[in-house]
């Protein structure tokens, strides 16, 4: 792990004067089925916000044909396009090549092959648990069939099994309580303590294997109005010895890039973190908050 001081030299030139913003390590472009934003637009927005670097992490969810959008990347085309942009903008901003990898137990052989063939091509891989029994909790139909409590229990149980099986294949666990964003009764049903056993099992896998936990500020824009995961989960990860936190807006549009980062920075300090982590070539670099 590389620690960078707060006085470390900028990671990209062309940024003069004024404070630089935290690197956004979770954002989407038109390569993701649920975004219409060209990668170039996100990059230009980041430059205007004085970010030294960003990590583009478009969706790659194998076996997601049941979704309305296409979440499976043409990996060679994706990598080629981002490498071209990385070179084009090298004097203005550092572009890290990432991916948000959808984890499902029944595609274990595919995930093994993906990591063998493409793992070294990325700077950063987010591991995400999105789907439950070929349903996306984003859609109300999932909750209508099972209810909020049962749906969340199943989500966290599956997430633990996925984290345990696939932790060698990712660097940071994305939006750990993702499903709680969309559960209709989240305000009354969901809390860390209500699902402590399942959530702690996930955090233990991450902490014991040196994996990062993502602070996803997209939750600030959800009905819950808090980051994902919940503050108590961030505190528990720290108590368990977890030290790597990645920060991402989950922006699918340029106006959401870096959303809530000042708020997240102060919150993470209150949770006991002094650094956040950026990945380059799959290696962690810790930056003072």
Predicted features by range, described:
Residues 2-9, 13-27, 39, 133, ...:
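Charged catalytic cores and adjacent phosphate/nucleic-acid-binding surfaces used
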Residues 68, 73-208:
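Extended substrate/RNA-proximal surfaces in nucleic-acid metabolism proteins
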Residues 22-24, 53-55, 94-98, 123-126, ...:
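Structural preference for beta-strand elements that scaffold enzyme active sites
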Residues 57, 128, 176, 216, ...:
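Conserved residues at the C-terminal ends of beta-strands
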Residues 15-113, 117, 182-193, 217, ...:
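An N-terminally biased module of ancient metal coordination in phosphate/nucleic-acid-related enzymes
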